[in-house]
Structure formats: C-alpha cells, structure tokens
Amino acid sequence: MIEMKPNGESNFYTFNRFYERFKNSDNRYDTWELIERYMQQLKEWYHSFDLFHHIGFLVATGTSVKSLLDIAMSTDHPIKKSDFKLRVLDMIREKMAFKVGDNDFGEDIDYAELNYEDHSEFIQYVLLLFNIETIRQKGDENVRFPFYRYKNEGTWSLEHIHAQNSESLKTNQEWKEWLEVHKKSLEGLEVSSDDKKQIEEVIDKMNTIITHINEKGYKGSIRDEFNAVAPAVINILSDGDDKSQMHTLSNMALLTVGENAALNNSTFDVKRMKIIAMDKAGEYIPVCTRNVFMKYYSSSDTKLHFWSEEDRKGYISAMNNVLYDYKEKNSNKEIKLIRNRINYGNRK
C-alpha cells in the first residue's frame, strides 16, 4: 500500500518491501521507527470518523496513500493536524473541479452539463462522494462507508435510474428477459379502466413474442416484433420523461445490478423491484441508490412506479444539501465540497 503496490502483486508486497529495506539497512532502528510512524498515522486516520471518509474518497479516486503520508509526516514542511484536515478538504474540492482537456488550462465543466456518454468518471466521483458524505454527515460512529466493498467487490457501476434504451439488446434471451420483467411491472400498475385496456393489449403482444421465442422453428423476426412493442412499454412506464436529461446526473446512480443486460436497460419500476428484492435478500445497496428507489428524495405526491421530473429535481436538491449546503452540527460552519450548486437542466 505505502510503496504503491503494482496490480497483481502479493498481498504481502508492503511487508516484503520493508523486509528488503530492513535487511539492507545499516540502521535498522531508523527503519523500524519509520514503520511505527506510518502505522501510527494510519491508525489515527482510521479512528478519525471524518478523515476515514475524506481520505477514503481521495484514495478511492486515485490519490496515493503515500502522497497523503508525505504531507502529514513531512519534517521539512510540518503541518498541524487541523491544517491537514483542511488540506484534505481542499484536495477533495480540487478533485471535484472537473475540466476537459489540459489539467491546468482545460475548460471547466458545469455539473449540470455532465453526461454519461462523455463524463462517466466525473459522474461516478459525484455519486461516490454523495454516498460517502450521506453516511458521514449522519455522524453515527458505528456506521461507516464500506470502502472495502467499493474496491474489492467490483459490482458498483454507473447506471441509469430510468432507462429508455432497449436497442442494445441483441439476443432472444435478452429480449425474453426484458419482456418478462417489464410485463410484471405493467401488471402491477394501478390505472384507469381506459389505460388498463391499453396496457392489457400491450401485455398480449408481449406474451405473443415470448411464445414465439419459446417456439422452436419459428420463422418470424423476433427483433422486429420486439422493436415494435418496446416503445409502447417504455412510454407507459415513463412519466412525462425529459429525454434530454437521460444521461445527466439527475438520472444516474451507483447500482449493483451486474451484467444482466435486460435489467440494465430497464425502466425505473423494474429496477425498483430488483432493489427491493436485493434488500430483502440482505445484499448491500449503496445508501443513496436505496434512497432513490425508495423515493426518499421525492415529495409524497409523486407516483411510486415512475421516475419523474419532480423526482429528478428532488434528487439534485439532495446532492446540493449534502455536497454544497452542509453545515457542521457543532460549529454551524459551512463545508462546501463542490465549487458551486448543481443545477437541474442546462447551465444557469
């Protein structure tokens, strides 16, 4: 860890590096003292609830532990513990000031202009910090952000909260899975009698396609049949959705749905049912992702089965409350971890 362990190296890499240094050292006492100082500093960070989360974010997004140790333990430029904490906050703000092009002279990107196709890494930074700070700001010393899950489990990906794209599905199995999960969602909707008739007609078409997929030797085009019904399904399960916001922060979450293409390309209600199933099974769900699908950030009068414009605005408002408007409970001091407020829609 301290010596920038390369990928694929043994878990004992750090020990082995120090052991080699120990063997070749003329003054083993100094080497051992250095090890103890490193260990003491790391333990101090770990036991500091705030530094655990703030340093954890920096390391999770590419800052080396060694560089942080160099700052905290420098003898040439000694730094007070209080000043080190402020320096860490500055490093987070610097990391959250996104630019395109040259690192020093590139163009600033407004948070509202971040989109999944061009800035997925930046969006992941925002959502990761949002999840970390949501936990840290609650102040429960017994509940910490699980960095070991984020690093080791490899299942956290950037996902659309509500997807409208079924074009990436290519196989009969993917089409069948998509039809089955969305049919279940349609069957659970509470609608008027007129809408119910329309939904039943769409479900009949979905059942026909599923039958054709299961039918050996079927000569028709499953692709054409699927492409004909999918837009109607998506339209029913969308609520006045603004397609211009499809790839923006307001429609993205850290989600652990894995490699299931049919689910990844599903609408909000289908993913919501999956999140509920995962929760019942005791699987870990990032806190802000769980809040999104449980409508924690939404007003009480929003429709449970849809991800609407009001829901997206509530989601962005929650990000601002945590990342821009947060005040320390004891001092009421503002801590802004992003350079300005996140707007919904275009830059204002």
Question: What spans do the regions from the language model cover?
Answer:
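Flexible coil/loop and intrinsically disordered segments
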Residues: 1-348
